[in-house]
């Protein structure tokens, strides 16, 4: 019997030590009170002979709690028996140890343990409608930062494998920087961010952060360049090229939990994908695990999106300024709403006539449901109707308008280079005509990287490749100088940041190449004072946002912080996953002869119009251009259905139409460029 009791205690001590200790404390105190009460009742003095067991027990407890209660039992010390006095003193002393010490010690330990567990994040969170971020990379803090500009309060839970304190510090620094920059605008922090450290594949830990009640779940990939060790970096890069099984594992787990009948409806799962193998498996998971009405899985192809963006920025550098705002929650941005409208021409015409603030873009159909897309400063702007009709003006468009040849120098490389070239291919298919080549590209890179791309022989528009590393200053400068002189049109210099280097070397090569390009411009300016610096458009990609000020000091307007674009897109998709199809559309040019896809273009005012438009309001300009580009009298190949979104001045100042369009005065000049949404 004793052996079985001892075995049971041993098992319970291993499974639930805290409960066993508490039970032992209670039993010892109970035994002590019973024994003390029995002895005191036997030794009661004159006047307390009637003190029974329960009264003795009561006084025992009172003496333990307050030693002054000894007087209630002893009475007059002179007449009390020595034995009773000694017993009472023993009760007080032993009680202080057994009761006060043990119980207070236990409670102190329990509270301390509770606080530690809370800091470690091991207790369950009871939340709903929150955003969950699984894993951490260089884009994660930008996702949280962009949510600062949301109209609503947001609760975000981050679950990472390790480095909780580092993540918390990074979030705090990023938010503090933004709040300091936006102090004049009155931006307030409406975010509640909880960071937890644990196993992102654990069902229990995922349920502990109420993943089944979240509005959105964002699954991030890992950074290969986060290490400072070259050998570790090489191993990570080799793994990244093959695929990312961790993302797949996390997605399967999340899809299972969010697809359950008990989970919340319409949950959005945004998953970063960086390679074809992972993307193909994500597609299969969507086919087998996605439950309509429960969870919608949206794969974000990081390299393809960055490649398309960088190719578009090379072709039209001002697009960087445009997308920087439109892909953000700050200022004017893209919105989507379910609609019964099926005809996009009728939709645009109606909204341009009736609405005050929203700029209509398109209507898209998916699975029998229709969604309208518009540009505005707030979703509420969609429902602000005009109080009075807008006057109309007439504009004359250049019916023979065609984009000029694009001259591009690619300086350096990154992991998105093939996707950048695919972006050029897509652009050529839409804009090459009559045997004329729209693209004219020179690539300057190291010999190993050029060999890896087979010296760009698959791309007939690459007219020259130059072997040079970051130390070949003269060769780089001479190549740029000669290419600029050989072409009458502007030249875009796309400076890429190598993302296959260690964390300490990130952006170093890009900054060195930027210095070389600025030297070329400075020398030309000294030789020919009238040289137009705008003839060389510098587009610099950086990976680490902390290097922004360094690059900006070289008078560069088009700084592409590549990670921020993905972060901004992920943020918007986490709130409106229907924007995914729209983004796919504007980032992809049509094949030759097709005009179904619509993109955002930058077009020179002087070439786009036959005559300069008069000074007018934004509302008048948008309506006039749309009528002139979509009229029934136009031939099909002339009908572009163009919606003007804003314009860019020669000095780089950008205006995107937002708010009350009737109050925005537009005075276009010959050197201005229009921002427009069009099918060609």
Task: Kindly give the residue locations of the regions a language model identified.
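Cytosolic regulatory regions of ion transport systems
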Residues: 1-680
């Amino acid at each position: 019997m004793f052996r079985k009791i001892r075995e049971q205690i041993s098992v319970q001590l291993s499974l639930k030590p805290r409960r066993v200790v508490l039970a032992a404390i209670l039993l010892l105190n109970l035994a002590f009170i019973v024994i003390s009460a029995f002895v005191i009742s036997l030794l009661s003095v004159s006047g307390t002979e009637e003190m029974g067991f329960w009264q003795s027990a009561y006084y025992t407890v009172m003496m333990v709690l307050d030693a002054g209660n000894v007087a209630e039992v002893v009475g007059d010390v002179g007449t009390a028996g020595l034995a009773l006095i000694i017993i009472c003193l023993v009760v007080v002393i032993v009680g202080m140890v057994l009761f006060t010490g043990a119980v207070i010690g236990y409670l102190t330990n329990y509270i301390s343990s509770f606080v530690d567990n809370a800091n470690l994040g091991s207790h369950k969170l009871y939340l709903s409608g929150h955003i969950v971020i699984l894993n951490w990379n260089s884009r994660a803090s930008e996702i949280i930062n962009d949510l600062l500009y949301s109209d609503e309060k947001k609760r975000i839970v981050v679950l990472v494998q390790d480095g909780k304190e580092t993540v918390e510090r990074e979030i705090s620094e990023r938010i503090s920087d933004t709040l300091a920059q936006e102090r004049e605008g009155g931006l307030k922090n409406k975010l509640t961010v909880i960071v937890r450290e644990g196993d992102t594949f654990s069902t229990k830990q995922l349920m502990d952060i109420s993943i089944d009640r979240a509005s959105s779940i964002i699954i991030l990939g890992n950074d290969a360049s986060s290490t400072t060790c070259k050998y570790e970096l090489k191993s990570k890069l080799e793994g990244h090229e093959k695929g990312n099984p961790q993302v797949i594992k996390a997605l399967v787990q999340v899809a299972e939990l969010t697809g359950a009948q008990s989970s919340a409806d319409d949950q959005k799962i945004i998953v970063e994908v960086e390679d074809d193998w992972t993307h193909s498996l994500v597609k299969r998971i969507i086919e087998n695990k996605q439950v309509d009405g429960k969870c919608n899985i949206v794969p974000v192809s990081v390299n393809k999106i960055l490649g398309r963006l960088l190719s578009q920025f090379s072709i039209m550098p001002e697009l960087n300024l445009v997308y920087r705002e439109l892909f953000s929650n700050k200022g004017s941005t893209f919105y989507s709403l379910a609609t019964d409208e099926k005809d996009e021409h009728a939709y645009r015409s109606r909204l341009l006539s009736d609405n005050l603030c929203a700029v209509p873009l398109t209507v898209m159909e998916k699975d029998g449901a229709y969604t309208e897309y518009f540009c505005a400063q707030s979703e509420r702007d969609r429902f602000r109707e005009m109080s009075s009709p807008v006057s109309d003006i007439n504009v004359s468009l250049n019916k023979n308008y065609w984009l000029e040849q694009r001259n591009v120098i690619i300086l350096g490389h990154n992991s998105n280079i093939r996707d950048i070239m695919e972006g050029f291919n897509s652009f050529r298919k839409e804009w090459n005509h009559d045997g004329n080549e729209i693209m004219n590209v020179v690539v300057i890179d190291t010999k190993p990287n050029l060999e890896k791309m087979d010296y760009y022989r698959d791309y007939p528009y690459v007219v020259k490749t130059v072997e040079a590393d970051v130390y070949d200053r003269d060769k780089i400068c001479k190549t740029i100088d000669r290419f600029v002189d050989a072409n009458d049109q502007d030249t875009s210099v796309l400076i890429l940041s190598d993302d296959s280097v260690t964390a300490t070397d990130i952006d170093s090569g890009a900054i060195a190449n930027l210095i070389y390009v600025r030297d070329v411009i400075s020398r030309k300016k000294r030789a020919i004072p009238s040289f137009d610096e705008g003839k060389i458009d510098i587009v610099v990609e950086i990976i680490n946002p902390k290097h922004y000020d360094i690059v900006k000091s070289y008078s560069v307007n088009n700084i592409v912080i590549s990670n921020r674009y993905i972060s901004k897109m992920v943020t918007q998709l986490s709130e409106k996953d229907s924007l995914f199809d729209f983004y796919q559309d504007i980032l992809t040019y049509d094949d030759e002869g097709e005009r179904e896809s619509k993109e955002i273009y930058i077009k020179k005012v002087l070439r786009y119009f036959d005559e300069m438009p008069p000074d007018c309001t934004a509302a008048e300009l948008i309506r006039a251009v749309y009528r002139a580009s979509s009229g029934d009298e136009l031939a099909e190949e002339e009908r572009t259905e163009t919606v003007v979104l804003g314009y860019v001045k020669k000095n780089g100042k950008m205006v995107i139409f937002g708010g009350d369009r009737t109050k925005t005065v537009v005075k276009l000049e010959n050197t201005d460029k229009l921002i427009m949404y069009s099918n060609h």
